[in-house]
Design a protein with these regions (language model features):
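Radical SAM enzyme [4Fe-4S]-AdoMet core and its adjacent flexible, acidic
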Residues: 29, 49, 72-75, 91, ...
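Conserved alpha-helical substructure of the radical SAM core
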Residues: 1-100, 112-114
Length: 182
């Protein structure tokens, strides 16, 4: 398998309007559960994808899980709503297993009580620091059909922070605008 999704928690710190949520009992995976699953999954993939219904950065053992993943030879891809990055950035960036982060910028608008500028600043600062360590960061903005009134502002902020030549949206139908490689 190219990657295997592993839900380390189904608990999220937000209640996004576009998310179906879950009715399952709230759960944070234990060290033992993670180690067991990592051992079972090892023969099948090199990539674990911390993603699904919960917010992985809300898990108090995220650093331990990244260390366990590294010890077993995994590379980790993590999807986050970005709101907790200022609190967990040092833990994430110290983890050799972290290969890529996908930051869902559409989470901002689907919630209230989040300061727009602080939120974007935290996500952008993390991506800058991650890139200095060779960690890939992808900004996701896919809230078509949902709350997307600030997409233009978000794209403008991305252009300001990450200057350079950008490819037009038409170059990637149904995908976010991307900076031109190189």
């Amino acid at each position: 398998f190219a990657k295997i999704y592993l839900e380390i928690t189904n608990v999220c710190n937000l209640a996004c309007s576009f998310c179906a949520g879950t009715t399952r009992k709230k759960h944070f995976m234990t060290r033992e559960e993670f180690a067991f699953l990592a051992d079972r999954l090892r023969p099948y993939t090199d990539f674990l994808y911390f993603h699904l219904m919960g917010e992985p950065t809300a898990h108090p053992l995220i650093g331990d899980f990244l260390a366990t993943a590294h010890a077993r030879g995994f590379r980790v891809i993590l999807t986050t709503n970005g709101t907790l990055l200022p609190k967990v950035a040092d833990t994430l960036l110290a983890a050799p297993a972290l290969f890529k982060t996908s930051l869902s910028l559409h989470a901002f608008e689907a919630n209230s009580g989040i300061d727009f500028e602080s939120y974007l600043q935290g996500c952008f600062d993390f991506a800058d620091r991650a890139s200095q360590q060779g960690i890939i960061s992808v900004f996701r903005l896919w809230n078509d059909g949902g709350k997307n009134g600030r997409n233009t502002e978000i794209l403008h902020a991305l252009h300001e922070r990450f200057s350079g030549e950008w490819m037009p949206e038409e170059a990637y139908p149904a995908k976010a605008v991307r900076p031109r490689p190189g």
